[in-house]
Amino acid sequence: MNPLTFTMITSTIILGTSIVITSSHWLTVWIGFEMNMLAIIPVLMKTHHPRSTEAATKYFLIQATASMLLMLAVTINLLSSGQWAVSNMIDPLALTIMTLALAMKLGLSPFHFWVPEVTQGVPLLSGLILLTWQKLAPLSILCTLSPNIDPTLILTMSILSVLVGGWGGLNQTQLRKIMAYSSISHMGWMTAILIYNPSLTILNLLLYIMMTSTTFILLIITSSTTTLSLSHTWNKTPLIAIIILTTMLSLGGLPPLTGFMPKWMILQDLTKNENIALSLFMAMAALLNLYFYTRLTYTTSLTMLPTTNNTKIKWHFKTTKQAASLSPLIIISTMILPLTPTMSALW
């Protein structure tokens, strides 16, 4: 891609998300969503492959439908209250339609079907942007609307998302699909606590972005897209194999790694709000995610395939642009569980 074009597209993606997050008027929120959507399409079609074109088309159709529902909800609220302010959405029907529209944009169940297909059809870097940065804008609007959202609707979607994210990833061998189902599950955890503690949703999102970014950067460095290609990592670079193991277990929420912290804090808040059954159910559903991540780490680090590699084992990383950002990301993704009491006090 031309450097000037790439700079313009990246700037538009960042600007669109920033407009959505900082806006207090529904019209500018809609403009920000549209800027972001139109700018991400060339990023998804970067490889000029039929699968990338198909993925970009699916993404466009889903996001356009969600934007249409968003404007429908805004119009209904405008007719009933005469307000354009984001914080003044009080009409129950408008709130329900808005919640469904934002759920489509986030990929929450039962609107999750596009997430694995689109992620599988795009390059790893595009998949990283799709599963991390693209979650910021819709989730920020959900946090703003959280005091008025119907608890039954949002909790139903969060429970379904955790279940679908766990069950869907069990029989997958494509790493991008596994990361997509992991994203669906994490979105379920974030929305489960949304109506009780929106700031904890933001903390969960930030940690999820850190862990997912670390995993994707490692996959980009090793050029791994399937479990078979990932299984050769130990023969080439054992250090990367060990880091992938710990990062994936952290994504699964295994203590004493970072990924256990948001789950711990969310379950604690749910039990404080007397949602014992919901917290127990979500803790059990989280085992599904942990299972397929454990299976991945077994394939990656606990088995060694026959190899004819006659070169010396490469303990060092390749000198790449992505490797420079790995050190802080790895530390954040795996080692900040001891900060949980501080995080609980702050969030």
From Swiss-Prot:
Catalytic activity: a ubiquinone + NADH + 5 H(+)(in) = a ubiquinol + NAD(+) + 4 H(+)(out)
Transmembrane segments annotated in the record for this chain: 13-33, 59-79, 84-104, 111-131, 149-169, 178-198, 201-221, 240-260, 276-296, 326-346
InterPro entries, per the entry: Complex_I_Subunit_2, NADH_DH_su2_C, NADH_UbQ_OxRdtase_chain2, ND/Mrp_TM
UniProt keyword list: Electron transport, Membrane, Mitochondrion, Mitochondrion inner membrane, NAD, Respiratory chain, Translocase, Transmembrane, Transmembrane helix, Transport, Ubiquinone
Topological category with respect to the lipid bilayer: Multi-pass membrane protein
UniProt KW DNA repair keyword: no
Subcellular compartments: Mitochondrion inner membrane
A Pfam family the protein falls into: NADH_dehy_S2_C
GO CC list: mitochondrial inner membrane
Main EC class the enzyme belongs to: translocase
GO molecular function terms listed in the Swiss-Prot or TrEMBL record: NADH dehydrogenase (ubiquinone) activity
Keyword Phosphoprotein: no
Functional description taken from the UniProt entry: Core subunit of the mitochondrial membrane respiratory chain NADH dehydrogenase (Complex I) that is believed to belong to the minimal assembly required for catalysis. Complex I functions in the transfer of electrons from NADH to the respiratory chain. The immediate electron acceptor for the enzyme is believed to be ubiquinone.
Subunit structure: Core subunit of respiratory chain NADH dehydrogenase (Complex I) which is composed of 45 different subunits. Interacts with TMEM242.
Family, as annotated: Belongs to the complex I subunit 2 family.
Protein name per UniProt: NADH-ubiquinone oxidoreductase chain 2
Originating organism: Chrotopterus auritus (Peters's woolly false vampire bat)
Upper lineage: Eukaryota, Metazoa, Chordata, Craniata, Vertebrata
